[in-house]
Swiss-Prot record:
Cross-referenced InterPro entries: AB_hydrolase_1, AB_hydrolase_fold, AB_hydrolase_sf, Epox_hydrolase-like
Pfam family, one: Abhydrolase_1
UniProt entry tagged with the keyword ATP-binding: no
Species annotation: Rattus norvegicus (Rat)
Keyword Aminoacyl-tRNA synthetase on entry: no
Protein name as annotated: Monoacylglycerol lipase ABHD6
TM segment ranges: 9-29
One annotated GO biological process: negative regulation of cold-induced thermogenesis
Active-site residue numbers: 148, 278, 306
Length: 337
């Protein structure tokens, strides 16, 4: 074979091998970096732009797509120990003509974390209101979506600032009082009684604990590679002391039943979405809300756990779009493609 041809194949093979080897090395040595790159790439692909806004010396980090228009803007509040990017799987299936805003909740990701901050549910509600005011998002009433802890905050926000919100989607929200405790809550109470707050199931510190948390929060049993589990843990470990402080605050007497105590004040059209197999917050919470919120509708998803947004993103997006169409434009029966 001609020497030039051999050289060409060697160069081509080397060119292909370098990025492949770099990827493999990154996967094995720095899985957390790959996870960050993954979110960056997904945001870019979906057209979500990251911005910062300040209220005095407090910084909020958020991502957005689109501009305010004749349709209500949509503000999305994530759950405990998550971040704004958890909504990307749903954003993928939402129409491009909606103005979407996903904010990092107080102390999370790019939003200020202060030891002086009030992390109670009401404290978080007031912070989110500051964010809304900074963006002037309430120049026209907007649609508010929250899941888990974010659902608790969203519901209380709608009760505290009714003129800001035109409609509401609560996805397996926390903050309700049940007649009986499920197994997860019983376990939390046992930990509380034994003062073993270092072993909160939602705050993993090893790949094994991360795997257990994923199984707790999901009905679908994902087969997650060990390196990805390690990467997920590596991303969280620097923040675990904050997560522990936040968790103890939101399950304290001050915040534990915040949504329950305010649900009768919610007057806007409300959509309640819940996974039937939720092991963290029992699906019976949907009926509790529906009985108290007059203008509400319930959507229970079969074969779905607590992580509704991650397990059923397409269905969640469809339910939200159809709900918005029915509430704000009854003549429009637009369906998702």
């Amino acid at each position: 074979m001609d020497l030039d041809v051999v050289n060409m194949f060697v160069i081509a093979g080397g060119t292909l091998a370098i990025p492949i080897l770099a990827f493999v090395a990154s996967f094995l040595l720095w899985p957390s970096a790959l996870i960050r790159i993954y979110y960056w790439y997904w945001r870019r692909t979906l057209g979500m732009q990251v911005r910062y806004v300040h209220h005095e010396d407090y910084q909020f980090c958020y991502s957005f797509r689109g501009r305010p228009g004749h349709k209500p803007s949509v503000l999305m509040l994530h759950g405990f120990s998550a971040h704004k990017d958890m909504w990307l799987s749903v954003v993928k299936f939402l129409p491009k003509n909606l103005h979407l805003v996903c904010v990092d909740m107080p102390g999370h990701e790019g939003t200020t974390r202060s030891s002086l901050d009030d992390l109670s549910i009401v404290g978080q509600v007031k912070r989110i209101h500051q964010f809304v005011e900074c963006l002037k998002l309430n120049k026209k009433p907007f649609h508010l979506i929250g899941t888990s802890m974010g659902g608790n905050v969203a519901g209380v926000y709608a009760a505290y600032y009714p003129s800001d919100v035109c409609s509401l989607s609560l996805v397996c929200p926390a903050g309700l009082q049940y007649s009986t405790d499920n197994r997860f809550v019983q376990r939390l109470k046992e930990l509380e009684d034994s003062a073993a707050t270092q072993k909160i199931p939602l705050i993993p510190s090893t790949p094994e604990e991360m795997s257990e948390m994923l199984q707790l929060c999901s009905y679908v049993r994902f087969k997650v590679p060990q390196q990805i589990l390690q990467g997920l843990v590596d991303v969280r470990i620097p923040h675990n002391s904050f997560y522990r402080k936040l968790f103890l605050e939101i399950v304290s007497e001050k915040s534990r039943y915040s949504l329950h105590e305010n649900m009768d004040k919610i007057k806007v059209p409300t959509q309640i979405i819940w996974g039937k197999q939720d092991q963290v917050l029992d699906v019976s919470g949907a009926d509790i809300l529906a009985k108290s919120i007059t203008n509400s509708q319930v959507e229970v998803l079969e074969n779905c756990g607590h992580s509704v947004v991650m397990e059923r993103p397409r269905k969640t997006a469809k339910l939200v779009v159809d709900f918005l169409a029915s509430v704000h434009n009854p003549d429009n029966n637009k369906k998702l493609n």
